[in-house]
Structures are given as C-alpha cells and as structure tokens.
Design a protein with these regions (language model features):
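N-terminal signal peptide c-region/cleavage motif recognized by signal peptidases
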Residues: 23-26
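Extracellular/periplasmic juxtamembrane helices and adjacent flexible linkers that interface
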Residues: 259-319
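Periplasmic-binding protein-like
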Residues: 120-125, 185-192, 199-200, 232-265, ...
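Short beta-strand->loop
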Residues: 36-38, 130-132, 150-177, 192-195, ...
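Short helix-loop capping/hinge motifs at secondary-structure junctions, enriched
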Residues: 133-139, 158, 171-179, 258-266
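N-terminal segment of the mature folded domain
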Residues: 29-159, 299-302, 309, 314
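Twin-arginine (Tat) signal peptide motif
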Residues: 2-13
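Ligand-binding pocket segment of bilobal, Venus flytrap-like solute-binding proteins
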Residues: 176-243
Length: 319
C-alpha cells in the first residue's frame, strides 16, 4: 500500500514538473513581429526595434525578434493587401493604410482612432536638399519650375513621400493663386516636367541625387535631408526650407487579422504604444522626425528643426 502511495506521489510530482516545464517553455517562447514600413525609416526602426525588444524583455520576460520591411509606401500597402503578413504597418500616409482596411479588411475602418494623434506618433515635412553653395539659387517652390533646373522626386504612384511632395507643391500653388485650381494644376505640372527620373521610393530618389549625382534639387523628407548631410558631411549639401510646406503625419496601425493569426496581439499593440513613450519620442527626434511630445526629446535634437509655415491636409484639402 505504501509502495502504491509512493508511486502515485511520484507520478503527481512528475506531472507537476512536466507542467512546469511546459509553462516555462510557453513563457520563454520568443515572439516575432513584422513591421511593414515605408522607405526612409530604416535607421529609425533599427534603433527603435532594439529599444523595444529590451523594454519588452525587461517588463514581460519575453524575447521579441522584430523584422522590418521597407519600400515605397503605396507599394508596401499593396504587398500587405496581396498577403504579406504584417503584424503592424507604419506607412507614409493614412490613405495607404485606409486602402488596406478597405480592400483587404485586415482591421477596422476606424483604425486611426485607436492611438493618439490620429495614430501618427511623429511628424515630418518636405524640404529641398541642394548641392553645396546652392548653385542654382533655389529658395522656394517657383524656383523649381525654372528652365535648366533638374528636380528629383519619387513616383507618386508608389511613394508616400512623393505624394507629400505633390501635396506641398499644390498647397503652395493654391496660396499664391488664391485658390485657383486650374493655375495650381499648371504650376504643379510644370514642376514635374523638370523631373528627369521617378524612383519608386524616397530612399531611391535620395540615392539618385546624393550618390549618382543626378539633379539640382531633391524634394525630400526632412529626416532624409538631415541624414544625407550627416552621412556625407555638411560640405556636400545644403537644406533649403521653402516658405510653405506641409505637415506630414505618417501613421501606424495594428493588423488585427494577422496578429490574431500569429498570437502577437499583445506585443504588437505594445510595440506601437511604445512609439509614444518618452524613449520612443527621443528615438524619433534623434532620427530627425518631429516628435509629438518634444519635452521627452534631447533639446539639441529639437533645436535642429527649422521654423516653417506648415499647412495640413485637412486645412487645405478638407477631411
């Protein structure tokens, strides 16, 4: 009888130990996330991914491996629609994320209301990058239409940055032509006649201008302009801030159907929320994005951003 009891006790202990091992294994299992992002966020998310992974392991005891895919924002949106299983998307325009919601129904149409600031944790704008000394004397949008000026911008059909470029030029035209859309259209059309090549994404256009030496002026995300000077030196390029530009608000979203399929909802939600944290805001500013909460950033990083009149999509084009 005693032997039988001892055997039962041993079996219970073994079962408990086995259950503990399974439980520990479940806790220790690494999480994996795929962030499908737009073209010039490589450096930003390289640092942010490392910071979030450290934060998640310290607070949750779980390792997380984060892969990030980059490309023109419109092209990336189409990839997700066609089946690329992103856990989160961090794209250049709300329009691109709307298209995923509408065409693939991977998350609700009201996705933009689920995080603060219309789900845009940082902002940017459009500036001009010119060669050192500004040999073509480019100061504002009308200078881009001059004969002999070669303008580099990506393709608006595939690039979110290119669409911000287009909207900024259009907003300027509406201002100087007092709302006359026909004159504004002619203005923007003339600008694009000076574009010799249309790359698919913003980083490709930066490469065309910076490394291949094509063009007199690059219409650039502000962060791309700063990064070009950081990497190649202030003796190569100058930044020209136009009299008017646009408040670019690159949004982020959770891809509900995919995170539920992957079992990553909790970590993916935390990943996006961490963009709004003091650390996330510091990292954004460090990489030349304008943080929503500048009080969390290094004051030296904030001081780099020039003052510029910024219009919004809603203010110029309506909601």
């Amino acid at each position: 009888m005693k032997t039988h009891n001892r055997r039962r006790t041993a079996l219970r202990l073994a079962a408990a130990a086995f259950g503990l091992v399974l439980s520990m294994g479940a806790v220790a299992k690494d999480a994996q996330l795929l962030n499908v992002s737009y073209d010039p966020t490589r450096e930003l998310y390289r640092d942010f991914n490392d910071a979030f992974a450290r934060h998640w392991q310290a607070t949750q005891g779980q390792k997380v491996a984060i892969e990030t895919s980059h490309g023109g924002s419109g092209k990336q949106a189409r990839a997700v629609i066609d089946g690329l299983e992103a856990d989160v998307v961090t794209l250049a325009l709300a329009y691109d994320i709307d298209s995923i919601a509408e065409r693939a129904r991977l998350f609700p149409a009201n996705w933009q209301k689920r995080l603060p600031d219309n789900s845009a944790p940082y902002t940017s704008t459009i500036v001009f990058l010119v060669r050192k000394g500004n040999p073509k004397g480019i100061r504002d949008w009308p200078d881009l239409l001059k004969s002999g000026v070669s303008v580099i911008t990506p393709n608006p059909k595939t690039s979110g940055g290119a669409r911000w470029n287009y909207l900024a030029a259009w907003a300027y035209g509406l201002k100087i032509f007092r709302g006359d859309e026909a004159k504004t259209r002619n203005f923007v059309t003339a600008l694009f006649r000076n574009v010799p090549v249309l790359d698919t994404g913003a980083r490709g256009s930066t490469t065309t201008f910076v490394q291949r030496g094509i063009g007199d002026v690059l219409l650039a995300w502000e962060n791309e302009a700063f990064l070009s000077i950081e990497e190649l030196g202030p003796d190569k390029f100058d930044i020209v801030v136009p009299s008017l530009s646009i408040l670019a608000e690159p949004p982020v979203a959770l891809v509900d159907r995919n995170v539920d399929k992957h079992g990553t909802r909790e970590v993916a939600q935390a990943y996006l929320q961490y963009l709004y944290s003091p650390e996330g805001q510091r990292i954004a500013a460090r990489h030349y994005y304008r943080p929503r909460h500048p009080q969390h950033a290094d004051p030296a990083d904030i001081a780099r951003f020039p003052q510029v009149e910024l219009v919004t999509i809603e203010g110029v084009f309506g909601s």
